[in-house]
Structure formats: C-alpha cells, structure tokens
A protein has these predicted regions:
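C-terminal tail/sorting-segment detector
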Residues: 1-5, 461-472
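Boundary/entry segment of secreted carbohydrate-active catalytic domains
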Residues: 23-45, 180-186, 191
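Active-site-proximal helices and loops of the catalytic beta/alpha 8
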Residues: 24-34, 38, 51-57, 66-69, ...
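Aromatic- and acidic-residue-enriched carbohydrate-binding clefts of CAZyme catalytic domains
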Residues: 28-30, 71-107, 136-188
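Substrate-binding cleft of carbohydrate-active enzyme catalytic domains
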Residues: 97-130, 134-138
Length: 472
C-alpha cells in the first residue's frame, strides 16, 4: 500500500515527541468494550448493563456507551431510537434508560474500575418540533445556551430543501467545515456560541454524570481542530473520533488537525487487515511496511507516530449491519486485534458469543504487558500471519491461519489457542491463570486459557479435559 502524502505529513511532526500534546493516554493498557449495537436497547440498556458490570470489569477497563441525550422521535425506554439525532442535550432520558439509571450505571462501572466513554453527537442536531427550533440548553452551573438558525451552517439542506417550508433559507451560519449530514441540522462550529454550548455540554456530562471520555460521532462533518478545542475545554481521559475512511492519510490528517489531541478509530486496519485481509485469506494484506522497512500490523497501528493514537476494532454498530461487516472467523480476528498496538475495542455481540476465546486473548495481552504503543513485528509468510509483540512483561507470538506451524517456538509456551489461531507467550511472562475461568454463555461449563473444558476434583484442584491438574 502506498501513502503518497504520508512522508510530507510525517516530516512536519518528526521533531515532536509522540505525546507532546493532547488528552491521549500514553502506553495505554486499556481494552474497551463497545457496550451496544444497533437497536439493542432491550439487551444493553442502562439497567441491563449495570447487571453485567462485574463481568464487564473482568475483561475491560473502558466501556463505550451509545448516545444518551434525548433524541428526535422520542419513545419509551427500550424503544428503537438509537439516539444519533439528538434533540435536547440537557435531557439524558433516552430509549436506553432514564437519567437516573445512567448515573447509577456509571457509578457502578466506576466502582468496578471501569471508565465510561460517552457517544457525543455534536456535528448535527434535530429541531424540537420543526427544522430549526432548538431546545434551550440549561446546564445549571455550567451555563445556559440556546442555538438558533443563525448557528446552522449555510450549506445545510434547510436552505435548499423546499420541504423546509418557512425555515427554507433561514440558516445563516458559516459554510460547513466538513461534509453535510442530511436529516438533521449541521451546526456551525466556527460560531463562538456553538463552541461555548458544546464545551458546557461536555463538562456537564463529565461533572454531573461522571463520563470519563468522548467518542465523537461523524467527524467527517466538522473540522478536526474543533475536537481539539473541545478536548482542551473538557480534559477527557480518552477521546476518539469516528473518522470513517479507509485511507491512512485521511485519518492521519484528521488526527493532526485535532492537534494530536484525540485518538481515531483505525478504519484503515478494519478494511486492510480484516475485511480485505483475514476474511479473504489474504494474509499479505494484514501487514504494512513502516517507512519501507519493518513489517507491522496493517492500519494506523503500523507506524510509530500513530499506533498510540489508534483505537482498533473488528466491527461496530454501523459496519455490523451492512456490507462493511467482517465476514471471516471472529476469534481469529481478535487474535490479531489483541496482539497489536493501539487501544483494542471489542464489539458487544462478538464478546458475548466468543467470550471463551476473547477473554483468554485479553488476559494474554495483559500478562505480557502489551500496550497501545508496543513494538510489533510481522514476519512474512504466504499462507499464514505471524507477529511478535514486545510487552513490558514478556513477548506474545501470534499465529493465524490453518497453515501456521503448530509447534511451540523455543523460548515460548502456549498461552491460548483456538481453531486456526494460537498465542505463545515468552518464558519470562508471569504464569498463572488470571481472568480466564468463567461461565460460558450457554451453560455453566468452565474453560481454561486454551478453551479446554475444566472441572474440580474432590481435593479442589482444577482439572483440564486432558487430565492435567492446573490450580487449587
């Protein structure tokens, strides 16, 4: 894969330390759960997630929640309004649950050691009862604001769509700084009022509800520099933007536009490594050369300037419901994801269906000390994928593919494995089983690091299916 503008872009920042600016955790050991999917309100609403908080905390340090503001269309708790057309920012009653249930969920997750990421939709906003009559934003001590048609981009369809009726031509804000979003009003982020409103909103979410960080929706819709401004004002633990583009250069340019003050979802990795790579048995697509030298896992994570600024994922609520969905072997995909740098984000349906594989993979990542900035080298093979990740506690060798060797490499021991994938951890890696014995979803059977069934004998020893005693 060629990156035409990458060299020019990197030369401009070559003298900067990787973490010179921004609210981005360095050498992060975080693993994130996307705690919802499209129309999962009855399964992953606030009340349901709170009941799962203990299990979530066994695997994850971050949970990304869906949009929690009252949205266009309204509806009851458990209804099918996902929330991506927010109507009233200071009303946190949604189809996902009530404001009180949201506060309770976040408190419970915090008590279990899990930080919470809000899905922030500020590119666009729905009118209260019509095209452009926004509700007032009363954030109490954080400030009160009211946006009008003067705060809507002049390029919004409200000025061109005849069905806007009396609102047609009334949007008098500056031209959009990004792509237009049809169906809701594009906010003019050059406006000082819009900026003040957004900053108050974020600080209110943080102060009143306990959110720790932000996932910015539809970042193609407004300039990246505004994300930097909003992060400076709200100081999130972690910020990640949905810059939905498979181009390395496009995502890198957006990160730079924020002032390197936000991470970005690694869509280049999603498409190269998963959709066009592993799903098609094209192992060569799963790695890129860093500066025409060392082979690394494909995506933003292939380069040292961006791997610590990437949130990697296999699927999300959007890609999972159309032809962007990953169609290959899911445990194999997470073997790649959890052996790679960046902050990995696990999709809720994948976690619940394949937890007996994903949990041991997460545990192996933690036991070897793999971080968002870890050095990972890919060795080239025509019929399988192989990488070695160097963590703070040991090394993790990952093999994916039916043709991959099954022997245990010298200096390593088997960490965990499944159909067509295996993790080997270096001998110096701390041993023992941690967060790896759990209830399988469909029954109460226990499994070990390698997915083998285990049980206890009369003396309390855990016995694997091959008869070996493992622990007491």
């Amino acid at each position: 894969m060629k990156h035409i503008t990458k060299k020019l872009l990197l030369s401009a920042i070559a003298l900067l330390p990787a973490w010179a600016v921004g609210q981005v955790p360095a050498n992060s050991t975080d693993v994130m759960l996307q705690g919802f999917y499209w129309n999962s309100q009855k399964l992953t609403g606030w009340a349901q997630l709170e009941q799962m908080a203990g299990d979530i905390a066994k695997d994850f340090t971050l949970v990304w929640l869906p949009p929690s503001a009252s949205a266009e269309g309204g509806g009851p708790v458990g209804g099918n309004n996902v929330g991506y057309h927010p109507r009233q920012w200071n009303n946190q009653n949604s189809n996902w649950g009530t404001a009180d249930q949201l506060k309770s969920l976040i408190t419970t997750l915090h008590n279990d050691g899990v930080r919470v990421i809000a899905d922030v939709v500020i590119n666009h906003r729905a009118g209260d009862t019509d095209w452009g009559n926004f509700t007032a934003d009363d954030f109490g001590s954080y400030g009160s604001y009211r946006l009008t048609a003067a705060n809507i981009c002049s390029t919004d369809e409200m000025n061109t769509d005849p069905s806007a009726g009396k609102w047609n031509g009334m949007a008098t804000g500056a031209p959009d700084t990004g792509e237009n979003w049809g169906g809701a009003r594009d906010l003019d982020h050059t406006s000082s009022l819009v900026q003040a409103d957004c900053e108050a909103y974020l600080n209110w979410l943080k102060g009143e509800y306990g959110y720790d960080g932000w996932r910015y929706d539809f970042c193609k819709g407004f300039g990246g520099k505004y994300v930097g401004i909003y992060n400076d004002a709200s100081s999130p633990y972690l910020s990640v933007g949905e810059m939905w583009d498979g181009s390395y250069d496009v995502v890198a340019e957006w990160i730079e536009a924020t002032g390197r003050k936000s991470m970005a979802f690694d869509f280049p990795s999603k498409y190269a490594a998963f959709n066009n790579g592993l799903a098609k048995g094209n192992y060569g697509s799963m790695s890129w050369q860093e500066d025409n030298s060392t082979w690394r896992p494909a995506g933003m994570i292939h380069h040292h300037n961006y791997r610590g600024l990437a949130v990697t994922f296999v699927d999300n609520h959007d890609t999972y419901r159309d032809d962007n969905k990953y169609t290959g072997d899911v445990p194999q995909a997470y073997a790649f994801l959890l052996a790679s740098p960046g902050v990995p984000c696990v999709f809720y349906p994948h976690w619940t269906q394949y937890r007996r594989f994903i949990s041991p993979q997460i545990d192996a990542r933690r036991r070897t000390g793999i971080t968002s900035e870890s050095d990972v080298v890919v060795t080239q093979h025509s019929g399988y994928y192989e990488s070695i990740s160097t963590g703070t506690k040991g090394k993790l060798l990952c093999r994916i593919g039916a043709a991959a060797p099954k022997d245990v490499p010298t200096g390593y021991r088997l960490g965990c494995s499944g159909d067509g994938w295996a993790y080997y951890v270096s001998e110096e890696t701390p041993s023992g089983i941690s967060q790896t014995l759990y209830d399988k979803n469909e029954d109460s059977t226990l499994y070990d690091l390698s997915g083998r069934e285990v049980k206890k004998d009369a003396k309390g020893f855990v016995i694997s299916s091959d008869g070996r005693k493992m622990l007491k």
